[in-house]
Amino acid sequence: MTSTLNTLKSNSGSRKKKLRKGRGIAAGQGASCGFGMRGQKSRSGRPTRPGFEGGQMPLYRRVPKLKHFEIINQKNFSIINLDKLKDFNDNDTVNLDSLVKKGLIFKPKFPLKILGNGKVNVKLTVQAHAFTKVAKQKIEDAGGSCELLNNK
């Protein structure tokens, strides 16, 4: 048998009738409409908003406003700008140990990062754990080299 438009039928159970609540007890959802006897949840205009706790001070208002969350796995660096490297001579190697000896870094607690503020007039070999783009460019323009050390 071929199917034509006038013989098409939807599958059984695919089209469900909408429940009409509050239209008499014979309909099965009359009177209290399946919402129970009394109380806020049975009234019109339901439901209550998400997070409503029945008038009790809600959790989002009981908890204090937290600010300044710490960054998880934050990378801390001992930073130094290029203008501090003017004490070094031509062809010197700049690393964390040489900066401590010159007194430019006092406590070498973190890995070294070179920032690009200032000028470099001498040819230096700089060994650090991180460089900014500007710092790396200025060191290489002065004829020096940047060696990237691995972070531990």
Curated annotation (Swiss-Prot):
Basic residues bias: start-end ranges: 14-23
GO cellular component: cytosolic large ribosomal subunit
Pfam families for the chain: Ribosomal_L27A
SUPFAM superfamilies: Ribosomal proteins L15p and L18e
GO terms for biological process, alphabetical: translation
Coiled-coil portions: none
Biased composition (Gly residues): 25-37
Domain of life: Bacteria
Entry keyword Ribosomal protein: yes
Gene Ontology molecular function: rRNA binding; structural constituent of ribosome
Annotated region (Disordered), positions in chain: 1-57
InterPro entries: Ribosomal_uL15, Ribosomal_uL15/eL18, Ribosomal_uL15/eL18_sf, Ribosomal_uL15_bac-type, Ribosomal_uL15_CS
Keyword entries, A-Z: Ribonucleoprotein, Ribosomal protein, RNA-binding, rRNA-binding
Protein family per UniProt: Belongs to the universal ribosomal protein uL15 family.
Quaternary structure, from the entry: Part of the 50S ribosomal subunit.
Function: Binds to the 23S rRNA.
NCBIfam families per the UniProt record, alphabetical: rplO_bact
Protein name: Large ribosomal subunit protein uL15
